[in-house]
Amino acid sequence: MDRTAAQLRIQELHREINRHNYLYYVEDRPEITDAEYDLLLRELQQLEKEFPDLVTADSPTQRVGAAPLDKFNQVSHRLPMLSLENAFNEGEMRDFDERIKRYLGLPMAKEIEYVCEPKMDGLAVELIYEEGSLTFGSTRGDGYVGEDVTQNLKTVKSIPLRLHCSPPPSLVEVRGEVYLGLAPFQKLNMDREEAGLPPFANPRNAAAGSLRQLDPRITARRPLSIFCYAPGLVEGYEFTSQSQMLATLPQWGLPVNPLIKKVAGIDAVLAYYREIGETRESLPYEIDGVVIKVDSFDLQRDLGEKTRSPRWAIAWKFPPRQAVTVVEDIVPQVGRTGVITPVAHLKPVEVSGVMVSRATLHNWEEMEKKDIRKGDTVVVERAGDVIPAVVKVMTEKRLEGAELLAVPAACPECGSEIVKIPGEVAIRCLGLTCPAQIRETIIHFASRHAMDIEGMGDKYVEQLLRLELVKTVADLYYLTKKDFMRFERMGDKLAENLLNAIEASKHRELSRFIFALGIRHVGEHTAKLLASAFGSVEHLEKATEEELLSIREVGPQVAQSVRTFFRNPANREVIERMFAAGVRPAVEEKRLGGRFTGKTFVFTGALTRFTRDDAKNMVENEGGHAAGSVSKKTDYVVAGAEAGSKLDKARQLGVNVLTEDEFLKMLEG
């Protein structure tokens, strides 16, 4: 291939790969397989290797991260990134609405058009595109001066390196919030604790810490996302309103929050705030309120700014997810990987509508740093599904004689030696037969998202261990009715149900089986990737590190962990014993010709005919995709009782709305 042909093909590959990146990371509806994507990327890499002078800054191959920096350079924003005034109740919101009308000389009966947006709890950044290419990115900083984090922002998969429009405006400055979703946050903290590193306190800190890494290669390994929400300077294109701007940005490849809504009047603003508050716990990311902006840019200019904040916008904060309680005890807890964690037993207190009686203290260094002691009065915080944590000690209320819990001299469960590996903050039990590790391993194996052995809860697992009926998960498949009849308060029918549940688990999907094995760093999503790539446990067991790394989203940490797991003879023996007992993981295959091929479904409200997990599986088994939010790409919304903002969004966009019965009829054909 000559240079001219290579240049044309490289440009074509840029467009194609960028489009598939957008579909995968922003729309969450891929059109090609990972293998097909990898072929495109490899072709581009090969062409760039042959013609290095054709490598451009906005090439998809340049996302992996540049060399580490010594420090971040400070940069000035051409337009200040002002902070927002806060409101904390309905009265303050009505005052805001009245102030705007008085300032503009409008009658109080006039309904102002507002745009309401979920207030993301992340890190504000500015992206600068020149002639369509991302050339610069910075943090908000103090609103006037931020830090140059261009190379790190280029690793965020949902940020396009080039705008999806032709011709692009000559200059586009856009502001957005970089965030880390709750599921990636929990996995990141789990990985850090297993690696002996201190966990992040919350998703916001994790996002900020990830984006401010001097080594962009570390940022590239963190699954950060972005929602854009405001323009800076724009040349070559004119926006007339906030709503028009938010409708245009996705056409350029820049993601915006799908829950944003344009409303008329303050009463509609109050209703939106209540709706978002009701759905807050089910969102896959953290929000801490709602941002309300006057929609018209002409009115925004008329209103102007105060010293630190615009007059035309306000942030209405949610009530804090914190409460004050007392630490009644601190108990060491052993996890399935041997990490020993101090756990605070609390006087029960309600936080965000949930009764909290325990909170993780993460590790001894963290506990000592926060100076948390038995009997202390503390502030606990609960964020989404994240385990409650102690965020502050009220030392002025400390009881005399309160002492820190000492690091245990031996494992509190089995008495084995404990170690603190250099460079780690975690302490670990080295006991190969530690009952706590075995218990947690079996509980994980039997859990709903793993082998789903119905009825096999914590109490039964503890009895199995106490009676020495199991030592590994493989032993579950050799249990008899006679074994279960040794349990306390066990009847014939219940024993038979447990045996039937164990039998039914023998043919679970391969991805569930891989997840159930408890391989470090392999969660549900990664297990699905591995199952899809290798098709059987035998093939996965023989996979080389190179083969593992060829899978999209599988990095060195996961690849090494998988190889380490299968190199362990004890692990292979457990798997062989399960296979000998009749365990045959089934390979799940998406039906390319299924009823729902190419269709995207969203489920909302209280479902009574099936669970959300069941619904997702039904859609995916028929070749479709189940998404978490409604957009113009959504084909169907299935609405249960008390459906809220997602149903409103569907009606606003003209998306087909189905009842549960109508969905089941579609499924049956």
Swiss-Prot record:
GO CC annotation, single: cytosol
Family annotation (SMART domains): BRCT, HhH1, LIGANc
Keywords: DNA damage, DNA repair, DNA replication, Ligase, Magnesium, Manganese, Metal-binding, NAD, Zinc
Domain BRCT: 591-669
Stored InterPro entries: BRCT_dom, BRCT_dom_sf, DisA/LigA_HHH, DNA_ligase, DNA_ligase_AS, DNA_ligase_CS, DNAligase_adenylation, DNAligase_N
Residue numbers binding Zn(2+): 411, 414, 429, 434
PROSITE patterns per the UniProt record, alphabetical: BRCT, DNA_LIGASE_N1, DNA_LIGASE_N2
EC code: 6.5.1.2
Catalytic activity: NAD(+) + (deoxyribonucleotide)n-3'-hydroxyl + 5'-phospho-(deoxyribonucleotide)m = (deoxyribonucleotide)n+m + AMP + beta-nicotinamide D-nucleotide
Binding site for NAD(+): 34-38, 83-84, 117, 140, 177, 293, 317
Catalytic site: 119
A GO BP annotation: DNA repair
Gene Ontology terms, MF aspect: DNA binding; DNA ligase (NAD+) activity; metal ion binding
Cofactor(s) listed: Mg(2+); Mn(2+)
Family of this protein: Belongs to the NAD-dependent DNA ligase family. LigA subfamily.
Name of this protein: DNA ligase
Organism from which the protein derives: Geotalea daltonii (strain DSM 22248 / JCM 15807 / FRC-32)
Gene that encodes the chain: ligA
